[in-house]
C-alpha cells in the first residue's frame, strides 16, 4: 500500500479547490498516509516546491476561495525532460502517487505522468464545468451564483435606462455556465457554443420584446463566441436602443465557495485518496447522479464528451 501522496492545484483557480485539498489531506491522514502539498501547480512540481502537510495546514481553508497551494500556467510541462525532473522530485520526497485538481489542461499533465509510470488521480476543479466524466465540476455552482448576482444588478440598471445589456460569461467552449445563469437570471437571449451566434434571430427577438413594451433586454454570451462590445454596437445600430456590454471576467473565479461546492470538493478529495489506497492510478473522479464515480483519465480526455443539455436549452427558449 502507498504511504505518501502529493496534491497540487493547476490551471485556472476555482472556488472549492481549498476544500478539495483539505479533503485529500484529512482523508489521507485519517488512513495513515503522509501528504505533501506542491505549490504553484506543475511549475512548483518541476521546481521542487514541495512541503509536508498536516491537519492544521488545512485548517480554516474550507470557506476560502482560490487555492492556498497556488496555481500557475506551465506549458513547459509538455516537455518529457521537464516531466522526468518532476517525477524525480516526487520520488526524492518518497511520494508514490499524485492528486491533481484542475481542468482539462491539468488532466493532460496527469495523463502524461501516468503514461510515464507515475500514478495520478484527477479531480475536476474549474468554473467552466467542461470536464468529461462528471455532472459538475468544483467551483461551477459558486461561479453560477456570482454570475446570477451580476445579472440581477444589470437588470436593475438596464430597466431604469431602458437599455439592452450583454453579459459575457466564462466557459471557454462549454456553455453550461451561460445557460444556467441565463435561465436563473431571466435573460432574454442566450449565445453559447452549443447554440451558435445568429444575429438576425437575436435582433428579431429583441425587437419583438421592444414591440411588446419591454423596458430592457439582457443577452447572456459565452466568452470567445464574439467580441461583446462589437456585438453591443451592432445591436444598438439595428434596434436604436442603447446597448452596453459587461465582461464579468475573473470575478467569476473568486469568492467563498457555496455549500454545494464545499461538500462536492470534500467528497471528491476523500474519494481520490480511497482510489489510491485501492491501488488505482491514471483515473479521474466525478459525480454522476449524485454518486462518486471514476474513469480512465486518458479515456476521459480523448474519448468522453460532455452531453449537451438539450432539455435545458428547450426550457430556456420557452422562458425567454
From Swiss-Prot:
Allosterically activated by ADP and other diphosphonucleosides, and allosterically inhibited by phosphoenolpyruvate. It is an enzyme of class 2 (transferase). The keyword NAD does not apply. Substrate binds at residues 126-128, 163, 170-172, 223, 244, 250-253. GO terms for biological process: canonical glycolysis; fructose 1,6-bisphosphate metabolic process; fructose 6-phosphate metabolic process. GO terms for molecular function: 6-phosphofructokinase activity; AMP binding; ATP binding; fructose-6-phosphate binding; identical protein binding; metal ion binding; monosaccharide binding. InterPro entries: ATP_PFK, ATP_PFK_prok-type, PFKA_ATP_prok, Phosphofructokinase_CS, Phosphofructokinase_dom, PKF_sf. Its cofactor is Mg(2+). It holds the Pfam family PFK. The active site is at residue 128. Its EC number is 2.7.1.11. Mg(2+) binds at residue 104. Keywords: Allosteric enzyme, ATP-binding, Cytoplasm, Glycolysis, Kinase, Magnesium, Metal-binding, Nucleotide-binding, Transferase. Its main location: cytoplasm. PROSITE patterns: PHOSPHOFRUCTOKINASE. ATP binds at residues 12, 73-74, 103-106. It is found in: Cytoplasm. Pathway: Carbohydrate degradation; glycolysis; D-glyceraldehyde 3-phosphate and glycerone phosphate from D-glucose: step 3/4. GO terms for cellular component: 6-phosphofructokinase complex. It catalyses: beta-D-fructose 6-phosphate + ATP = beta-D-fructose 1,6-bisphosphate + ADP + H(+). ADP binds at residues 22-26, 155, 186-188, 212, 214-216. Belongs to the phosphofructokinase type A (PFKA) family. ATP-dependent PFK group I subfamily. Prokaryotic clade 'B1' sub-subfamily. NCBIfam families: PFKA_ATP, PRK03202.1. Homotetramer. Catalyzes the phosphorylation of D-fructose 6-phosphate to fructose 1,6-bisphosphate by ATP, the first committing step of glycolysis. This is ATP-dependent 6-phosphofructokinase. The gene is pfkA.
Amino acid at each position: 500500500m502507498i504511504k505518501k501522496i502529493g496534491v497540487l492545484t493547476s490551471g485556472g483557480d476555482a472556488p472549492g479547490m481549498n476544500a478539495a485539498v483539505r479533503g485529500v489531506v484529512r482523508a489521507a491522514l485519517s488512513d495513515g498516509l503522509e501528504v505533501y502539498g506542491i505549490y504553484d501547480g506543475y511549475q512548483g512540481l518541476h521546481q521542487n516546491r514541495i512541503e509536508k502537510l498536516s491537519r492544521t495546514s488545512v485548517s480554516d481553508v474550507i470557506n476560502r476561495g482560490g487555492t492556498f497551494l497556488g496555481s500557475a500556467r506551465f506549458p513547459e510541462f509538455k516537455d518529457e525532460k521537464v516531466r522526468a525532473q518532476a517525477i524525480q522530485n516526487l520520488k526524492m520526497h518518497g511520494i508514490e502517487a499524485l492528486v491533481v485538481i484542475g481542468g482539462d489542461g491539468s488532466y493532460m499533465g496527469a495523463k502524461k505522468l501516468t503514461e510515464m509510470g507515475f500514478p495520478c488521480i484527477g479531480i475536476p476543479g474549474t468554473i467552466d464545468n467542461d470536464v468529461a466524466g462528471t455532472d459538475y465540476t468544483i467551483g461551477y455552482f459558486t461561479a453560477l451564483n456570482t454570475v446570477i448576482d451580476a445579472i440581477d444588478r444589470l437588470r436593475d440598471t438596464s430597466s431604469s435606462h431602458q437599455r439592452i445589456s450583454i453579459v459575457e460569461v466564462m466557459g471557454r467552449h462549454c456553455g453550461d455556465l451561460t445557460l444556467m445563469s441565463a435561465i436563473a437570471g431571466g435573460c432574454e437571449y442566450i449565445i453559447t457554443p452549443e447554440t451558435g451566434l445568429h444575429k438576425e434571430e437575436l435582433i428579431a427577438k429583441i425587437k419583438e420584446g421592444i414591440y411588446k413594451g419591454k423596458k430592457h433586454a439582457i443577452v447572456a454570451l459565452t466568452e470567445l463566441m464574439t467580441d461583446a462590445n462589437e456585438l453591443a454596437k451592432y445591436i444598438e445600430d439595428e434596434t436604436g436602443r442603447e446597448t452596453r456590454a459587461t465582461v464579468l471576467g475573473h470575478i467569476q473565479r473568486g469568492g467563498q465557495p457555496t455549500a454545494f461546492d464545499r461538500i462536492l470538493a470534500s467528497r471528491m478529495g476523500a474519494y481520490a485518496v480511497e482510489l489510491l489506497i485501492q491501488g488505482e492510478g491514471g483515473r479521474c473522479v466525478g459525480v454522476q447522479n449524485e454518486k462518486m464515480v471514476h474513469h480512465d483519465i486518458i479515456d476521459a480526455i480523448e474519448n468522453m464528451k460532455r452531453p449537451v443539455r438539450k432539455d435545458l436549452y428547450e426550457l430556456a427558449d420557452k422562458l425567454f
